[in-house]
Amino acid sequence: MLQSLNRSVRYLSTSIGSRLYCSNTNQTTKNNTNASGVNDNQQTHFGFKTVNKEDKESMVKDVFDSVSSSYDLMNDVMSMGIHRLWKDELINTLNPTPGSHLLDVAGGTGDISFRFLDKIKTSPNYFPNINKSNNGGGEVLKSSSLPSSATVFDINQSMLNEGKKRGLNKGYTDQSDPSIDWVQGNSEQLPFKDNTFNCYTVSFGIRNCTNIDQVLREAYRVLKPGGRFLCLEFSQVPNPLLRFAYDQYSFNVIPIMGQLISGDRDSYSYLVESIRKFPDQETFVQMIQDAGFKQVTYKNLTFGICSIHSGFKL
């Protein structure tokens, strides 16, 4: 059954892929520092619920503890496989080269980091380490290209554990070339020095953070001058008719899928609600600018169901 499902997902991804990209937009709008609509400084939203800020982190952790083992399959089912094309577009937009060091926040199971490392290896300027046999032993001839790495950062250890398994199957470790490592922590308090990374990505994760403004400030802090911030996130569909159809699917179908595949309807209901609470495209542009980033732009994918926001530390 799962093989048939995966074949269907791949077919839908291919057939719909030509309609993926809809618009590129540069926007500067009024600031909305409390996009959740919650006015109390001690409160925030958890889906459509209002909760204490100190409680949200553990509540989000519980959600991803519950869905970690089925997360990748659910992404395929919920998006009909299109999330793979969205993630490919994120990496194509970044276009990393050898010598790049990525911080992949909310990187969970490694989807973005693996694409990043694969892209590095296709660069004409990439030359891998070579194992040379020598009397039954072996020595490693170091690559002449600049070292590259990805650091997957996530608040949820269960998601990281799933990612590590996938990384080993792909041959990516902290000793591979290029390399990957896995760090658990809070994106509002990154355990990295200033000016450490060339690029920072966050994919379908920033909407789950308690203090998005602080997450953006931390992103700015750890990027090197000239570094790039990229965020792939579900957004707001501008067309009213399409938005209505999307809402019907999201609220009535996705939770049922969650129940059938992972046995957890409530977690997927939260994920749908969290999408609706996330700021619209133009408001998020202003939030990124307020964190210090320049040349902030976004482009909508698949009619605005999600968008890629970009900014530079200049």
Swiss-Prot record:
Q: Which Pfam families match?
A: Ubie_methyltran
Report which reactions are catalysed by this protein. Answer: a 2-methoxy-6-(all-trans-polyprenyl)benzene-1,4-diol + S-adenosyl-L-methionine = a 5-methoxy-2-methyl-3-(all-trans-polyprenyl)benzene-1,4-diol + S-adenosyl-L-homocysteine + H(+)
Instruction: Give the EC number(s) under which this enzyme is classified.
Output: 2.1.1.201
Q: In which pathway does it act?
A: Cofactor biosynthesis; ubiquinone biosynthesis
Q: Which GO terms describe its biological process?
A: aerobic respiration; methylation; ubiquinone biosynthetic process; ubiquinone metabolic process
Keyword set for this entry? Membrane, Methyltransferase, Mitochondrion, Mitochondrion inner membrane, S-adenosyl-L-methionine, Transferase, Transit peptide, Ubiquinone biosynthesis
Summarizing the function annotation, the protein's role is: Methyltransferase required for the conversion of 2-polyprenyl-6-methoxy-1,4-benzoquinol (DDMQH2) to 2-polyprenyl-3-methyl-6-methoxy-1,4-benzoquinol (DMQH2).
Protein name stated in the entry: 2-methoxy-6-polyprenyl-1,4-benzoquinol methylase, mitochondrial
Per the UniProt record, the source organism is Dictyostelium discoideum (Social amoeba)
Phylogenetic lineage: Eukaryota, Amoebozoa, Evosea, Eumycetozoa, Dictyostelia
